[in-house]
Amino acid sequence: LLIVNKEPYIIVHPTQKKVDKTLANAVVNYFEKTLGKTLVPRFYNRLDMNTSGLIIIAKNAYTQAFLQDKTEVKKTYKVIASGIIEEDDFFIEKPIGKIGDDLRRIELSEENGGKSAKTHIKVLERNYEKNITFLEARLYTGRTHQIRAHLSLIGHSLVGDELYGGNMEIAKRQMLHAFKLEFQNPKTLENLKIEIDIPIDMKEVLK
C-alpha cells in the first residue's frame, strides 16, 4: 500500500488536456525510484482536483481486490460550509445524479437515474462572524461530488465551491479535505486508522 496526502490543484489521472504533472505520473516515478520497476498505480479512491487529502494506492491486484471486496474503508472529510448549520449531528440521505452535460449532481430519484447517497454530518465549530461552519462528513456511499452535492441540497454549499454556489469571497477552491481513513491491513488484518491535518488554506479561512 501507498498512502498519499494529495495537495489541492493536482489532478489524479492524466486527461486529454493534462497528460503530465498528475498524481499518477508522480506515483509511477516514485515506484521506479524506490522499487526499481514500473508499477501501474491502482487508486482505491480518487479526489477532485481542488480537493485535498488522503488517497490509497494499491501496489498489486490482491491489495486492490481486498480493499474493494474484503474490508470496509471508512472515509471521513473535514469541510468548511457556507452559512451556519444549526443541527449538531445528523445524516443527509438524498439520492443524487446528473442530467446531461451539467457537471453538478442534483437530487434525482433512483427511478430517474439517481443513486442512493448517505452522508453523516458532525458540526465541529460555528463561526458567526464569517458565517461559516466547520464540520466532519463521513461517507456511507461513494458517489461523485457526494459531500458537495448533499451540503448544497440543504442550503450550505462548501466555501469556495463555485460549481455549487458556495461563498467565493474567502476561498478560491472548495474547502474539502479527506483527513481520515480506517480499514484493515491487507497483510496482517489489523485495523488501521490514518489521519492528516487540514492544509494551510483551510486553517486561514477558519481564523
Sequence positions of predicted segments:
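Conserved short-loop catalytic and cofactor-binding motifs
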Residues: 11-12, 135, 169
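Flexible glycine-rich active-site/ligand-binding loops centered on an Asp-His dyad
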Residues: 20, 77-82, 153-168
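The conserved catalytic core of RNA pseudouridine synthases
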Residues: 37-68, 94, 98-154, 178-207
